[in-house]
């Protein structure tokens, strides 16, 4: 039996790297659906009905700077916000960072 010495691992590494990239590309594919406001309102109503026994409801709010929605989970008895998804603080931070970066990058419209 003749076993040749492998001088480099580059061909093996290239094949591994290609497989990993192909797998990542397939994992990132998420179908995007367009949802109208009426459909969204209907879905929120159904979720609130589902949450009635737990005494909380959902409220969708539009972030003023990012123009993206986030969800507030609100306790019915006290009207207190229990949780925000994603947290509004994070969205504020992201908006501030994009505004800061926008000062350095000339945006063409």
Swiss-Prot record:
Superkingdom of origin organism: Bacteria
InterPro entries: FlaG, FlaG-like_sf
Pfam families membership: FlaG
Name of this chain's protein: Uncharacterized protein YvyC
Organism: Bacillus subtilis (strain 168)
Gene: yvyC
């Amino acid at each position: 039996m003749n076993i040749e010495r492998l001088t480099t691992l580059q061909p093996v590494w290239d094949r591994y790297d290609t497989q990993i990239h192909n797998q990542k590309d397939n994992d990132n594919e998420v179908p995007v659906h367009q949802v109208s406001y009426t459909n969204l309102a209907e879905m929120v109503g159904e979720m609130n009905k589902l949450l009635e026994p737990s005494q909380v409801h959902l409220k969708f709010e539009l972030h003023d700077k990012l123009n993206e929605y986030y969800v507030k989970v609100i306790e019915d008895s006290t009207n207190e916000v229990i949780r925000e998804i994603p947290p509004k603080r994070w969205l504020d931070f992201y908006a501030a960072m994009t505004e800061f970066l926008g000062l350095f990058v000339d945006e063409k419209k």
